[in-house]
């Protein structure tokens, strides 16, 4: 029942998000035809407004937009006029999902072991070194890490391509740029979860029963210590997708982040609203999946 209620709640929530995005994007100064290569005459501008129904009242435009959404149509792009929003999403979303997925796996693969090691070696060199490394990557934004990686690994050493997206080698530097920050966040969450779990009574009981330290750490402590990371996974995936805006622009990757930035700057109303709705759906679905995974890992949790 809990999951059915969550799914049923999606519809009114998406209506609210669509209305807010549709209204707010039109409050921004400027219009979708202000940055034409050649300044449009008043007659041409009026014709363009009429063609895309932008001369109608906002409430009427919104109802027309909802009618298209019901049919799976996000409308035409006002900047990329030979393409619809649906076409552009179909083109860019797989690229952004691939980049975000690889960065997610990288962040988990680095952050969880690093947090585990620092917690188990609390007060030792491993703890201090790992904690410093996690804090360091958190403090350096992708806008700084990206150019550094390009200059060192691409321009100086020629190990990886500078930009674009076409082979596995093209994905290495963008994945590192996007995933390093989140690996530090996960490491800190894992360390805190592990330290809290190691002080629990059931861990003391397990040790008193004569279980080996390896069994205590991996069979009993790890399963509960990783729960904060699981809870963070939903927002993490959403952050990776939105954080890819910067990375995609640095490395000129043809994902939806590039389209989102360009559409926002050019007041491409339909594109902006369509991408906002897309990210909202992804966030809602990911949070629901995280709740389900959390209940599987911790049997004490029951959603009703």
Task: For each feature predicted by the language model, list its residue ranges.
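Alpha-helical transmembrane segments of multipass membrane proteins
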Residues: 13, 17, 21, 142, ...
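Cytoplasmic-entry segments and transmembrane alpha-helices of multi-pass inner-membrane transporters
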Residues: 1-9, 113-149, 250
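Hydrophobic alpha-helical transmembrane segments of membrane transport/permease proteins
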Residues: 13-64, 79, 154-173
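Alpha-helical transmembrane segments of integral membrane proteins
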Residues: 1, 89, 93-126, 165-304
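Transmembrane helix irregularities
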Residues: 28, 137-140, 241
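Membrane-interfacial helix-loop-helix junctions in multi-pass membrane proteins
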Residues: 50-58, 75-82, 186, 262-270
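An internal, D/E-rich "acidic patch" concept
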Residues: 55-112
């Amino acid at each position: 029942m809990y999951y059915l209620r969550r799914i049923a709640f999606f519809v009114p929530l998406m209506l609210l998000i669509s209305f807010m995005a549709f209204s707010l994007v039109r409050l921004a100064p400027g219009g979708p035809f202000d940055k034409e290569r050649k300044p449009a005459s008043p007659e041409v501008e009026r014709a363009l407004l009429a063609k895309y129904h932008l001369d109608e009242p906002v409430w009427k435009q919104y109802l027309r937009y909802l009618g298209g959404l019901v049919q799976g149509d996000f409308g035409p792009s006002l900047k990329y006029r030979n393409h619809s929003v649906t076409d552009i999403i179909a083109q860019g979303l797989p690229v952004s999902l691939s980049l975000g997925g690889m960065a997610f796996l990288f962040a988990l693969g680095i952050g969880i072991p690093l947090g585990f090691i620092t917690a188990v070696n609390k007060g030792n060199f491993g703890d201090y070194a790992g904690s410093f490394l996690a804090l360091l990557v958190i403090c350096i934004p992708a806008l700084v890490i990206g150019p550094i990686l390009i200059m060192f690994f691409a321009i100086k050493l020629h190990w990886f391509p500078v930009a674009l997206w076409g082979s596995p080698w093209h994905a290495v530097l963008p994945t590192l740029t996007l995933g390093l920050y989140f690996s530090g966040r996960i490491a800190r969450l894992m360390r805190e979860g592990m330290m809290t779990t190691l002080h629990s009574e059931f861990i003391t009981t397990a040790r008193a029963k004569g279980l080996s330290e390896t069994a205590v750490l991996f069979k009993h402590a790890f399963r509960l210590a990783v729960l904060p990371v699981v809870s963070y996974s939903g927002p993490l995936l959403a952050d990776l997708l939105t954080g890819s805006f910067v990375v995609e622009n640095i490395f000129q990757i043809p994902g939806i982040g590039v389209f989102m930035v360009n559409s926002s700057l050019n007041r491409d109303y339909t594109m902006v609203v369509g991408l906002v709705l897309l990210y909202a759906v992804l966030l809602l679905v990911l949070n629901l999946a995280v709740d389900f995974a959390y209940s599987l890992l911790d049997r004490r949790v029951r959603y009703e």
